[in-house]
Curated annotation (Swiss-Prot):
Region (Disordered): 1-41, 235-263, 296-315
Source species of the chain: Danio rerio (Zebrafish)
DNA-binding region, residue intervals: 38-106
Annotated tissue distribution: At the shield stage, expressed uniformly in the future ectoderm. At the 75-80% epiboly stage, becomes localized to the presumptive neuroectoderm; strong expression in the presumptive forebrain, weak expression in the presumptive spinal cord. At the tail bud to 3-somite stage, expressed in distinct regions of the future brain, the anterior margin of the neural plate and the future retina. At the 12-somite stage, strong expression in the central nervous system rostral to the hindbrain, including the optic vesicle.
CDD domains reported in the protein's UniProt record: HMG-box_SoxB (cd01388)
Name of a matching Pfam family: HMG_box
Compartment(s) where it occurs, according to its Swiss-Prot or TrEMBL record: Nucleus; Cytoplasm
InterPro entries referenced in this protein's UniProt entry, alphabetically: HMG_box_dom, HMG_box_dom_sf, SOX_fam, SRY-related_HMG-box_TF-like
PROSITE patterns, per database record: HMG_BOX_2
Chain positions of motif 9aaTAD: 270-278
Biased composition (Low complexity): 236-258
Originating gene: sox2
Protein name: Transcription factor Sox-2
BP terms from Gene Ontology: brain development; cell population proliferation; epithalamus development; eye morphogenesis; fin regeneration; forebrain development; inner ear development; inner ear receptor cell development
Free-text note on domains in this protein's UniProt record: The 9aaTAD motif is a transactivation domain present in a large number of yeast and animal transcription factors.
């Protein structure tokens, strides 16, 4: 638009274009230099800004052409109609002269190339969202056939929650350890009565995991997961892994182990009473669950007893 501001309609001699060199590209220069191209007649603003642009460019040689155009546009809007009148008349004269010289002229604007949409430019990585579905719903309620997808989404959730991938990997390895040998025969008798309710209720694990983060007690969730059936869905297994990794074993002395064991026993009995039908099974199940929690919290921690186990003399 500003290619014609610095030159007259018919310049007597070629003059260097001082103000309009910044807003033309190579294709614009080729079309400008071609003799077949017919320029559009200048409007009133272009007639007025032709002298003002040259003056402002001389006063501010380092100012960019776009900034000059912004300032000239603001000044043109502030002019009154009486001040604009001579430039409007000059633009009408130039338009009439242009129509006389080029009667067959028709303005053909150049078509702009289509740019990519923002949603096409900035797409999410391939593993975070399922194609055509909700990523959170797919990550929580997965079935048994989506093992690789669960691991990938768990890694992404680990970064979101502030936990490193190493913590999840260590807890997944601990899930593969065999159970304590003294508990195998004792737990087989209680395996079936424990799971008379539906296992699909664990699919709301996002809310329970957040409560487990706040409470900081992974003993119930781990003992519950170890007594579950082998046909457990991977979504619930992922929730157990997250709840276990949310709290590390506490670094305490041997004297405080007995107090912690008593508190855990009381909490376990309160939790077990919500699920077990009779009171005669509470003591046995509490002992077995406490054994399991001690087995999975038995990682060597500095400052604890041998293997980090809690003495059972208080039971």
């Amino acid at each position: 638009m500003y290619n014609m501001m610095e030159t007259e309609l018919k310049p007597p001699a070629p003059q260097p274009n001082t103000g309009g060199t910044g807003n033309t590209n190579s294709s614009g220069n080729n079309q400008k230099n071609s003799p077949d191209r017919i320029k559009r007649p200048m409007n009133a603003f272009m007639v007025w800004s032709r002298g003002q642009r040259r003056k402002m460019a001389q006063e501010n040689p380092k100012m960019h052409n776009s900034e000059i155009s912004k300032r000239l546009g603001a000044e043109w809007k502030l002019l009154s109609e009486s001040e604009k009148r001579p430039f409007i008349d000059e633009a009408k004269r130039l338009r009439a002269l242009h129509m006389k010289e080029h009667p067959d002229y028709k303005y053909r604007p150049r078509r702009k190339t289509k740019t990519l949409m923002k949603k096409d430019k900035y797409t999410l990585p391939g593993g975070l969202l399922a194609p055509g579905g909700n990523g959170m719903g797919a990550g929580v309620g997965v079935g048994a056939g989506l093992g690789a997808g669960v691991n990938q989404r768990m890694d992404s959730y680990a970064h979101m929650n502030g936990w490193t991938n190493g913590g999840y990997g260590m807890m997944q390895e601990q899930l593969g350890y065999p159970q304590h040998p003294s508990l195998n025969a004792h737990n087989t008798a209680q395996m079936q009565p424990m799971h008379r309710y539906d296992m699909s209720a664990l699919q709301y694990n996002s809310m329970t995991n957040s409560q487990t983060y706040m409470n900081g007690s992974p003993t119930y969730s781990m003992s519950y997961s170890q007594q579950s059936t082998p046909g457990m869905t991977l979504g619930s297994m992922g929730s157990v892994v997250k709840s276990e990794s949310s709290s590390s074993p506490p670094v305490v002395t041997s004297s405080s182990h007995s107090r912690a064991g008593q508190c855990q026993t009381g909490d376990l009995r309160d939790m077990i009473s919500m699920y077990l039908p009779g009171a005669e099974v509470q003591d046995q199940s509490a002992q077995s669950r406490l054994h399991m929690s001690q087995h999975y919290q038995s990682a060597p921690v500095p400052g604890t007893t041998i293997n980090g186990t809690i003495p059972l003399s208080h039971m």
